[in-house]
UniProtKB/Swiss-Prot annotation:
InterPro entries: Porin_dom_sf, Porin_Euk/Tom40, Tom40. It is a multi-pass membrane protein. Residues 11-36 have a biased composition (Pro residues). The keyword Ribosomal protein does not apply. The keyword Protein transport applies. Residues 1-72 are annotated as: Disordered. The lineage of its organism: Eukaryota, Metazoa, Chordata, Craniata, Vertebrata. This is Mitochondrial import receptor subunit TOM40 homolog. Belongs to the Tom40 family. Pfam families: Porin_3. One of its GO terms (molecular function) is protein transmembrane transporter activity. Keywords: Ion transport, Membrane, Mitochondrion, Mitochondrion outer membrane, Porin, Protein transport, Transmembrane, Transmembrane beta strand, Transport. Residues 40-50 have a biased composition (Gly residues). The gene is Tomm40. It is found in: Mitochondrion outer membrane.
Length: 361
């Protein structure tokens, strides 16, 4: 979707340096103490689900399973979540590549306001500095969720990523995001999401330009068919001078207490994931992707080992391209420090990348 969004912008001089797509902006800095930042993909937290059914997720506790059973007895179906979150549970198990040295300092100025300083030094990519701000509003929906949420991130070159998320009503959530590259305005989008008791519908409008006649419109819909099965689709319409097109995808998600299987099939290809919670400490995932445009397929296996008593989190992965990766996070109590180590090895290209990170606060 991010490639389509970039393609919808009219050409204007040389392209700016590569930047993340607007739909997938870099993750915001951690939320202030005592609050949980809502998913930027539009998913609603448990605090805003009161009276509208609860989302079915694998690995739920016994009380959650009992609640789901009660919903079935009274004829109610659970909310299926959002279309963008279909593959998220599996993809979160895979390690994220980090190269060089990264230092992050989180400073909570109050219960609602936090700033973040990040310095990254790399041997391959450019070294940079990021300043992030997170503000959580006073509209309290639950002990861990409040609105509006304002998130901003600016680097040393002046490039800005900013998002505003607000809960307009118990079922309606909106988001606005902008992205600049130095002094140039790159992307902006507006999202609206409505979550009912057994369905979720969302619309995204990106980079609309009435004068040039360009823009992109994305519509998502996901419906619970049974307590375990949800079906839905995505429709993407993009237009710019001399070009327009529509891309459609269908999705299916099957959820049980400790595993989740999801498949997305469309004109661009196929994407399938399987997530399994083996225990409270071990989670595994398998991902398969096939692209009709690139004429390429890939398969990946990832796992996450979490030992809370040891303050230890490990993620590992291997894929069909013979790329092996791993990350390790170790908290160092009583100090507010988190140590991160990362290593990736590409056997085919004989390349090795490693990274070291330290988070304070």
């Amino acid at each position: 979707m991010g490639n389509v969004l970039a393609a919808s912008s009219p050409p204007a001089g040389p392209p700016p340096p590569p930047t993340p797509s607007l739909v997938g902006l870099p993750p915001p800095p951690p939320s202030p103490p005592g609050f949980t930042l809502p998913p930027l993909g539009g998913g609603l937290g448990t605090g805003s689900n009161a009276g509208r059914g609860s989302e079915r997720t694998p690995g739920a506790a016994a009380s959650g399973a009992a609640a789901s059973s009660n919903d079935g007895n009274c004829g109610c179906l659970p909310n299926p979540g959002t279309f963008e979150e279909c593959h998220r549970k599996c993809k979160e198990l895979f390690p994220v590549q980090m190269e060089g040295v990264k230092l992050t300092v989180n400073k909570g100025l109050s219960n609602r306001f936090q700033v973040t300083h990040t310095v990254a030094l790399g041997t391959i990519g450019e070294s940079n500095y990021h300043f992030g701000v997170t503000y959580v509003g006073t509209k309290q929906l639950s002990p861990t969720e409040a609105f509006p949420v304002l998130v901003g991130d600016m680097d040393n070159s002046g490039s800005l990523n900013a998002q505003v998320i607000h809960q307009l009503s118990p079922g309606l959530r909106s988001k606005m995001a902008i992205q600049t590259q130095q002094s140039k305005f790159v992307n902006w989008q507006v999202d609206g999401e409505y979550r009912g008791s057994d369905f979720t519908a969302a619309v995204t409008l990106g980079n609309p330009d009435v004068l040039v006649g360009s823009g992109i419109l994305v519509a998502h819909y996901l419906q619970s068919i049974t307590p375990c099965l949800a079906l839905g689709g995505e429709l993407v319409y993009h237009r710019r001078p001399g070009e327009k097109g529509t891309v459609m995808s269908l999705a299916g998600k099957y959820t049980l207490n400790n595993w989740l299987a999801t498949v997305t099939l469309g004109q661009a290809g196929m994407h399938a994931t399987y997530y399994h919670k083996a225990s409270d400490q071990l989670q595994v995932g398998v991902e398969f992707e096939a692209s009709t445009r690139m004429q390429d397929t890939s398969a990946s296996f990832g796992y996450q080992l979490d030992l809370p008593k040891a303050n230890f989190l490990f993620k590992g992965s291997v894929n069909s391209n013979w790329i092996v990766g791993a990350t390790l996070e170790k908290k160092l109590p009583p100090l507010p420090l988190t140590l991160s180590l990362c290593a990736f090895l590409n056997h085919r290209k004989n390349k090795f990348l490693c990274g070291f990170g330290l988070t304070i606060g």
